[in-house]
Amino acid sequence: MSDPRLPAAFLQPGSSSFSDFLAVQAPDLLPGRRAVPQGHAGDLAPHGTTIVAATFPGGVVMAGDRRATMGNIIAQRDIEKVFPADEFSAVGIAGSAGLAVEMVRLFQTELEHYEKIEGSTLSMDGKANRLAALIRSNLGMAMQGLAVVPLFAGFDLASNQGRIFSYDVTGGRYEETAFHSVGSGSLFARGSLKKLYRDDLTAEQTVQAVVEALYDAADDDSATGGPDVTRRIFPVVQVMTADGGRRMPDADVATIADRVIAGRMTSPDGPTAPLTARPLEGA
């Protein structure tokens, strides 16, 4: 028996893509279908900044700082930029914060809708491709300064390993090896991880490495916020393994952040990479 409160389209079998369903039934609800005034609007909206992800044997870690900026103004000090996408994956946002959060919600619904319609979850590559399509639909706004550039990571049940995907504003999808970072402080975060990352790190060591990387990014990029010990605001950290994804409790992140800060009191530039000296030939 049909439900008179719902339009007929909601009761008919259809596409496993929720965004395809919206495109037919309510296209104005899709971010990329809205009319945008001409001109550059990038400085009119808060921007999320630095997201970092790194793999370890048995999983992957994603972390994001808590600062949002609007031009030279700190728009928010405790924004959350890392969200669970489904049970085994997470997405971190950089770019126009409002549009990015909306895209994450649509992506979460997209994955949930697919699972309900098909009775199974999308593969890791399938999830990455769905996110790429959503980013591509935002290209018009990106050309006017309202870009969304997320970082996607999760545990792949098929290959039994953590995987990381980055994107460009056109929806181009690129799988990354070992670690990656996006956002205004990403250059400094990646440079930090080049010195800190090892492929035999434990989950906790990987979390400390990404927190160190965010600290280094905040040290050189004014749009990235470091651990705020006065307000007790620390990065959001998601850990994904074969058991699923979980947000690391704030108290645990605070313990690691305090450890990082204590180390910086004696070594302001952070840990150093060990060098093995070899005698020069003929010396």
Curated annotation (Swiss-Prot):
- Class of this enzyme: hydrolase
One GO CC annotation? cytoplasm
Q: Which InterPro entries match?
A: Ntn_hydrolases_N, Pept_T1A_subB, Proteasome_sua/b, Proteasome_suB-type, PSB_actinobac
Q: Where is the active site?
A: T49 (nucleophile)
- Report the EC code(s) recorded for this entry: 3.4.25.1
Q: Which residues form a coiled coil?
A: none
Q: Which PANTHER family match?
A: ATP-DEPENDENT PROTEASE SUBUNIT HSLV, METALLOPROTEASE TLDD
Q: What is this protein called?
A: Proteasome subunit beta
Q: Which organism is it from?
A: Nocardioides sp. (strain ATCC BAA-499 / JS614)
Q: Which gene encodes it?
A: prcB
